[in-house]
Amino acid sequence: MTGTTWHLLRTESTSPAENMAIDEAIANWVAKGELKPTLRFYSWAPHAISVGRFQRATRDLDRDALEANNIPVVRRLTGGRAVLHADELTYSVILPESTPALPTNIIESYRLLTEGVRRGYRELGVPAEFSVPLTEEDREALRKPKSAVCFDAASYYELAVDGKKIAGSAQVRHQGAVLQHGSIPLSVDDEVLFDCFAMDETEKQEAKTRFSEKAVALNDTLKRFVSFDEVAAAFETGFKDAFSLTFEPLVFTKEQQAEIDLLVKKYESDEWVWKR
Protein backbone atom coordinates (compact mmCIF):
# COMPACT_ATOMS: atom_id res chain seq x y z
CA MET A 1 0.00 0.00 0.00
CA THR A 2 3.05 2.25 0.16
CA GLY A 3 4.45 4.29 -2.72
CA THR A 4 1.12 4.66 -4.51
CA THR A 5 -1.22 7.46 -5.57
CA TRP A 6 -4.44 8.03 -3.64
CA HIS A 7 -7.32 10.42 -4.10
CA LEU A 8 -7.59 13.36 -1.70
CA LEU A 9 -10.95 15.01 -1.01
CA ARG A 10 -11.95 17.93 1.23
CA THR A 11 -15.63 18.61 1.84
CA GLU A 12 -16.10 21.32 4.46
CA SER A 13 -19.39 22.29 6.13
CA THR A 14 -21.34 19.35 4.73
CA SER A 15 -24.63 18.03 6.12
CA PRO A 16 -24.51 14.97 8.42
CA ALA A 17 -26.39 12.73 5.99
CA GLU A 18 -24.23 13.77 3.05
CA ASN A 19 -21.04 13.20 5.02
CA MET A 20 -22.02 9.60 5.73
CA ALA A 21 -23.35 9.11 2.20
CA ILE A 22 -20.06 10.27 0.66
CA ASP A 23 -18.05 7.85 2.81
CA GLU A 24 -20.28 4.93 1.85
CA ALA A 25 -20.33 5.86 -1.84
CA ILE A 26 -16.54 6.11 -1.99
CA ALA A 27 -16.27 2.73 -0.25
CA ASN A 28 -18.57 1.22 -2.89
CA TRP A 29 -16.52 2.66 -5.76
CA VAL A 30 -13.16 1.74 -4.22
CA ALA A 31 -14.37 -1.84 -3.68
CA LYS A 32 -15.32 -2.08 -7.38
CA GLY A 33 -12.01 -0.57 -8.54
CA GLU A 34 -13.71 2.56 -9.88
CA LEU A 35 -11.73 4.86 -7.56
CA LYS A 36 -8.26 4.79 -6.07
CA PRO A 37 -7.88 4.56 -2.29
CA THR A 38 -9.13 7.84 -0.86
CA LEU A 39 -8.22 10.09 2.06
CA ARG A 40 -10.93 12.57 2.94
CA PHE A 41 -11.16 15.48 5.38
CA TYR A 42 -14.51 17.02 6.26
CA SER A 43 -16.51 19.09 8.72
CA TRP A 44 -20.18 19.22 9.68
CA ALA A 45 -22.89 21.85 9.12
CA PRO A 46 -24.96 21.80 11.16
CA HIS A 47 -23.19 20.23 14.11
CA ALA A 48 -24.55 16.74 14.71
CA ILE A 49 -24.46 13.58 16.77
CA SER A 50 -23.42 10.40 14.97
CA VAL A 51 -24.21 7.04 16.52
CA GLY A 52 -22.64 3.67 15.83
CA ARG A 53 -24.36 1.33 13.43
CA PHE A 54 -25.53 -1.00 16.22
CA GLN A 55 -25.98 1.59 18.97
CA ARG A 56 -29.40 1.86 20.63
CA ALA A 57 -30.03 5.51 19.87
CA THR A 58 -33.62 5.28 21.07
CA ARG A 59 -32.29 4.38 24.53
CA ASP A 60 -29.10 6.47 24.69
CA LEU A 61 -30.17 9.84 23.28
CA ASP A 62 -32.52 12.51 24.63
CA ARG A 63 -34.56 13.42 21.55
CA ASP A 64 -36.24 16.39 23.22
CA ALA A 65 -32.86 17.90 24.15
CA LEU A 66 -31.53 17.27 20.66
CA GLU A 67 -34.49 19.08 19.11
CA ALA A 68 -34.18 21.96 21.60
CA ASN A 69 -30.50 22.36 20.68
CA ASN A 70 -31.17 21.87 16.92
CA ILE A 71 -28.74 18.96 16.79
CA PRO A 72 -29.60 16.32 14.17
CA VAL A 73 -28.64 12.66 14.49
CA VAL A 74 -27.11 10.42 11.84
CA ARG A 75 -26.26 6.72 12.08
CA ARG A 76 -22.83 5.69 10.82
CA LEU A 77 -21.95 2.65 8.73
CA THR A 78 -19.26 1.92 11.34
CA GLY A 79 -19.81 0.69 14.88
CA GLY A 80 -18.86 2.31 18.16
CA ARG A 81 -20.53 4.87 20.37
CA ALA A 82 -21.95 8.37 19.89
CA VAL A 83 -19.84 11.37 18.85
CA LEU A 84 -20.77 15.06 18.84
CA HIS A 85 -19.35 16.51 15.62
CA ALA A 86 -18.90 20.24 16.24
CA ASP A 87 -15.57 22.08 16.18
CA GLU A 88 -13.52 19.30 14.63
CA LEU A 89 -11.87 17.79 11.59
CA THR A 90 -13.21 14.41 10.58
CA TYR A 91 -11.06 12.13 8.45
CA SER A 92 -11.90 9.02 6.48
CA VAL A 93 -9.55 6.61 4.77
CA ILE A 94 -10.96 4.09 2.32
CA LEU A 95 -9.06 1.38 0.46
CA PRO A 96 -9.66 -2.10 -0.98
CA GLU A 97 -9.79 -4.93 1.54
CA SER A 98 -7.36 -6.79 -0.76
CA THR A 99 -4.67 -4.10 -0.45
CA PRO A 100 -1.23 -5.75 -0.06
CA ALA A 101 0.24 -5.40 3.45
CA LEU A 102 -3.15 -4.47 4.94
CA PRO A 103 -3.76 -6.85 7.86
CA THR A 104 -6.93 -8.91 7.73
CA ASN A 105 -7.27 -8.50 11.50
CA ILE A 106 -9.37 -5.39 12.18
CA ILE A 107 -7.39 -4.28 15.24
CA GLU A 108 -4.07 -4.57 13.40
CA SER A 109 -5.37 -2.82 10.26
CA TYR A 110 -6.76 -0.09 12.52
CA ARG A 111 -3.31 0.36 14.06
CA LEU A 112 -1.70 0.53 10.61
CA LEU A 113 -4.09 3.13 9.18
CA THR A 114 -4.04 5.20 12.37
CA GLU A 115 -0.29 5.66 11.91
CA GLY A 116 -1.14 8.36 9.36
CA VAL A 117 -3.22 10.13 12.01
CA ARG A 118 -0.47 9.77 14.62
CA ARG A 119 2.07 11.35 12.28
CA GLY A 120 -0.39 14.14 11.54
CA TYR A 121 -0.50 14.98 15.22
CA ARG A 122 3.29 14.92 15.30
CA GLU A 123 3.33 17.49 12.48
CA LEU A 124 1.33 19.75 14.81
CA GLY A 125 3.73 19.16 17.69
CA VAL A 126 1.44 16.78 19.59
CA PRO A 127 3.20 13.65 20.97
CA ALA A 128 0.24 11.34 20.37
CA GLU A 129 0.85 7.65 20.99
CA PHE A 130 -1.16 4.47 20.58
CA SER A 131 -3.30 3.49 23.54
CA VAL A 132 -3.40 -0.15 24.64
CA PRO A 133 -5.67 -1.00 27.60
CA LEU A 134 -3.22 -2.63 30.03
CA THR A 135 -5.22 -3.08 33.21
CA GLU A 136 -8.24 -5.27 33.82
CA GLU A 137 -10.13 -2.11 34.80
CA ASP A 138 -9.39 -0.57 31.39
CA ARG A 139 -10.43 -3.73 29.56
CA GLU A 140 -13.62 -3.97 31.61
CA ALA A 141 -14.44 -0.35 30.68
CA LEU A 142 -14.32 -1.37 27.01
CA ARG A 143 -16.45 -4.47 27.53
CA LYS A 144 -19.03 -2.59 29.62
CA PRO A 145 -18.96 1.13 28.74
CA LYS A 146 -20.18 3.44 31.48
CA SER A 147 -21.83 5.79 28.99
CA ALA A 148 -22.93 6.02 25.36
CA VAL A 149 -20.23 8.64 24.65
CA CYS A 150 -17.31 7.67 22.44
CA PHE A 151 -14.58 9.76 24.06
CA ASP A 152 -14.88 8.56 27.67
CA ALA A 153 -12.56 5.57 27.07
CA ALA A 154 -9.75 4.73 24.65
CA SER A 155 -9.89 1.41 22.80
CA TYR A 156 -7.02 -0.60 21.34
CA TYR A 157 -4.64 1.54 19.25
CA GLU A 158 -6.60 4.75 19.60
CA LEU A 159 -4.46 7.84 20.05
CA ALA A 160 -3.83 9.47 23.40
CA VAL A 161 -1.71 12.21 24.94
CA ASP A 162 -0.70 11.84 28.58
CA GLY A 163 -3.27 9.09 28.91
CA LYS A 164 -6.13 11.15 27.47
CA LYS A 165 -7.91 10.17 24.27
CA ILE A 166 -7.36 12.76 21.53
CA ALA A 167 -9.06 11.06 18.56
CA GLY A 168 -11.95 8.64 18.19
CA SER A 169 -12.07 6.33 15.17
CA ALA A 170 -14.05 3.36 13.90
CA GLN A 171 -13.54 0.88 11.07
CA VAL A 172 -15.78 -1.38 9.00
CA ARG A 173 -15.29 -3.87 6.17
CA HIS A 174 -17.91 -3.03 3.53
CA GLN A 175 -18.43 -5.00 0.31
CA GLY A 176 -14.70 -5.46 -0.26
CA ALA A 177 -13.54 -2.06 1.01
CA VAL A 178 -12.11 -0.96 4.35
CA LEU A 179 -13.60 2.28 5.66
CA GLN A 180 -12.05 3.94 8.69
CA HIS A 181 -13.20 7.35 9.82
CA GLY A 182 -12.60 9.37 12.92
CA SER A 183 -13.20 12.56 14.87
CA ILE A 184 -10.37 14.99 15.64
CA PRO A 185 -11.86 17.50 18.12
CA LEU A 186 -10.35 20.98 17.97
CA SER A 187 -12.41 22.06 20.99
CA VAL A 188 -15.24 20.48 22.99
CA ASP A 189 -18.32 21.97 24.66
CA ASP A 190 -19.12 19.27 27.20
CA GLU A 191 -22.31 21.04 28.34
CA VAL A 192 -23.86 20.63 24.89
CA LEU A 193 -22.39 17.14 24.51
CA PHE A 194 -23.89 15.65 27.64
CA ASP A 195 -27.22 17.43 27.24
CA CYS A 196 -27.76 15.18 24.22
CA PHE A 197 -27.87 11.96 26.23
CA ALA A 198 -30.61 10.32 28.27
CA MET A 199 -29.04 10.72 31.72
CA ASP A 200 -30.18 12.05 35.05
CA GLU A 201 -28.15 14.85 36.67
CA THR A 202 -26.01 12.50 38.75
CA GLU A 203 -25.15 10.35 35.73
CA LYS A 204 -24.42 13.48 33.70
CA GLN A 205 -21.99 14.87 36.28
CA GLU A 206 -20.23 11.51 36.59
CA ALA A 207 -19.93 11.31 32.79
CA LYS A 208 -18.50 14.83 32.60
CA THR A 209 -15.90 13.96 35.23
CA ARG A 210 -14.86 10.80 33.37
CA PHE A 211 -14.73 12.75 30.12
CA SER A 212 -12.43 15.43 31.58
CA GLU A 213 -10.14 12.69 32.91
CA LYS A 214 -10.14 10.56 29.75
CA ALA A 215 -10.33 12.96 26.78
CA VAL A 216 -8.69 16.15 25.51
CA ALA A 217 -9.16 18.42 22.48
CA LEU A 218 -6.42 19.69 20.19
CA ASN A 219 -6.67 23.37 21.20
CA ASP A 220 -6.27 22.39 24.86
CA THR A 221 -3.28 20.18 24.12
CA LEU A 222 -1.48 22.85 22.09
CA LYS A 223 -2.77 25.73 24.26
CA ARG A 224 -3.52 27.72 21.11
CA PHE A 225 -6.15 27.97 18.39
CA VAL A 226 -5.79 25.60 15.45
CA SER A 227 -7.84 25.87 12.27
CA PHE A 228 -9.38 23.18 10.10
CA ASP A 229 -6.94 24.12 7.30
CA GLU A 230 -3.88 23.78 9.55
CA VAL A 231 -4.98 20.39 10.84
CA ALA A 232 -5.92 19.11 7.37
CA ALA A 233 -2.50 20.11 6.00
CA ALA A 234 -0.73 18.37 8.89
CA PHE A 235 -2.73 15.17 8.48
CA GLU A 236 -2.18 15.13 4.73
CA THR A 237 1.56 15.25 5.44
CA GLY A 238 1.15 12.57 8.11
CA PHE A 239 -0.43 10.12 5.66
CA LYS A 240 2.08 10.99 2.94
CA ASP A 241 4.97 10.24 5.29
CA ALA A 242 3.44 7.12 6.83
CA PHE A 243 2.73 5.40 3.50
CA SER A 244 4.97 7.22 0.96
CA LEU A 245 1.89 8.48 -0.89
CA THR A 246 1.19 11.02 -3.57
CA PHE A 247 -2.28 12.52 -3.88
CA GLU A 248 -4.50 13.63 -6.71
CA PRO A 249 -7.75 15.55 -6.16
CA LEU A 250 -11.08 13.75 -6.36
CA VAL A 251 -13.93 15.43 -8.24
CA PHE A 252 -17.24 13.59 -8.50
CA THR A 253 -18.93 13.04 -11.85
CA LYS A 254 -22.64 13.82 -12.28
CA GLU A 255 -23.35 10.10 -12.09
CA GLN A 256 -21.38 9.72 -8.87
CA GLN A 257 -23.12 12.72 -7.32
CA ALA A 258 -26.47 11.16 -8.20
CA GLU A 259 -25.45 7.99 -6.33
CA ILE A 260 -24.45 10.09 -3.33
CA ASP A 261 -27.80 11.88 -3.42
CA LEU A 262 -29.62 8.54 -3.25
CA LEU A 263 -27.58 7.50 -0.23
CA VAL A 264 -28.31 10.85 1.45
CA LYS A 265 -31.99 9.88 1.53
CA LYS A 266 -31.06 6.69 3.40
CA TYR A 267 -29.02 8.55 6.01
CA GLU A 268 -31.77 11.15 6.47
CA SER A 269 -34.49 8.56 7.03
CA ASP A 270 -35.88 7.80 10.48
CA GLU A 271 -35.94 4.15 9.43
CA TRP A 272 -32.12 4.18 9.34
CA VAL A 273 -31.37 6.67 12.13
CA TRP A 274 -33.84 5.39 14.73
CA LYS A 275 -33.99 1.75 13.72
CA ARG A 276 -32.76 0.77 17.17
Swiss-Prot record:
PROSITE patterns: BPL_LPL_CATALYTIC. Its EC number is 2.3.1.181. The record marks K165 as: Lowers pKa of active site Cys. Keywords: Acyltransferase, Transferase. The keyword Transferase applies. Residues 33-247 form the BPL/LPL catalytic domain. Catalyzes the transfer of endogenously produced octanoic acid from octanoyl-acyl-carrier-protein onto the lipoyl domain of GcvH, an intermediate carrier during protein lipoylation. Monomer. In the reaction, the free carboxyl group of octanoic acid is attached via an amide linkage to the epsilon-amino group of a specific lysine residue of lipoyl domains of lipoate-dependent enzymes. The reaction proceeds via an octanoyl-thioester enzyme intermediate. This is Octanoyltransferase LipM.
